[in-house]
Amino acid sequence: MSQSGSVLRRNGFTFKQFFVAHDRCAMKVGTDGILLGAWAPVADVKRILDIGTGSGLLALMLAQRTDDSVPVDAVELDAGAAMQAQENVAHSPWPHRITVHTDDIQRWAPRQTVRFDLIISNPPYYEPGVECSTPQREQARYTATLDHQTLLAIAADCITEDGFFCVVLPEQIGNAFTQQALNMGWHLRLRTDVAENEARLPHRVLLAFSPQAGECFSDRLVIRGSDQNYSESYTALTQAFYLFM
């Protein structure tokens, strides 16, 4: 879908090359997912796994960023969200590359005979506590159905030796997630701390882990400048996706 041919619609988010409907998904398209999909390293990637795809946002972004020969498997537990992801994929330029699986990743992963160079997830991060408005939203937001230790273990079983496992998390939770990953034998290779503007402390962190040891590259990304417009660095990262950048 070209920019000139794109139509703004109310039930989702219009990007330059695709549209993501999310009205039947517990978690809507947001800055976290867009950041992660634009940031994850894709050089030499041959196969991608999206854990908890929701609306299919990350799978679609990564399909746009990678070669047409790269398959993307997107796994989603919630049947309603998975159906909407399938519809979003069907209307995108990449229906031949993205496969949406309606399944629990804990059941799906052990059945796989191939490994993935890139595994990506915008995971739940709240411990069970205050109830959400719907069971679907609770599932998407809370770790009861997929705790971080289980997620890290599944990724370890599915990844290639030199692959990357990428997540986005709130800053403090990301620090705890990193320590947990290191304790399980992962190596932190990329870290970007994200702040709303220069005056604020980082509120999100983008993390890339690998089974393979190596130098860790760290930086900071500010979303908005002092004029409240998107910063140059945020624009450079996401302009291939945002419709009016």
Curated annotation (Swiss-Prot):
Show the GO MF annotations: nucleic acid binding; tRNA (adenine-N6)-methyltransferase activity
Protein EC: 2.1.1.223
State the compartments where it is located.
Answer: Cytoplasm
Q: Which PROSITE patterns does UniProt cross-reference here? A: N6_MTASE (PS00092)
Quickly give the catalysed reaction. Answer: adenosine(37) in tRNA1(Val) + S-adenosyl-L-methionine = N(6)-methyladenosine(37) in tRNA1(Val) + S-adenosyl-L-homocysteine + H(+)
Q: Name one GO biological process term.
A: tRNA processing
What class does this enzyme belong to in the EC scheme? transferase
Q: Which UniProt keywords apply?
A: Cytoplasm, Methyltransferase, S-adenosyl-L-methionine, Transferase, tRNA processing
The record's section on InterPro entries has:
DNA_methylase_N6_adenine_CS, SAM-dependent_MTases_sf, Small_mtfrase_dom, tRNA_Adenine-N(6)_MTase, tRNA_adenine-N6_MeTrfase
Name one cellular component (GO) term.
cytoplasm
Report the Gene3D superfamilies cross-referenced here: Vaccinia Virus protein VP39
The family database entries (PANTHER family) matched by this protein are listed as:
TRNA1(VAL) (ADENINE(37)-N6)-METHYLTRANSFERASE (PTHR47739:SF1)
Q: What does this protein do?
A: Specifically methylates the adenine in position 37 of tRNA(1)(Val) (anticodon cmo5UAC).
Which family does the UniProt entry place this protein in? Belongs to the methyltransferase superfamily. tRNA (adenine-N(6)-)-methyltransferase family.
Name of the molecule in the record: tRNA1(Val) (adenine(37)-N6)-methyltransferase
Q: What is the lineage of its organism?
A: Bacteria, Pseudomonadati, Pseudomonadota, Gammaproteobacteria, Enterobacterales
Q: Which gene encodes it?
A: yfiC
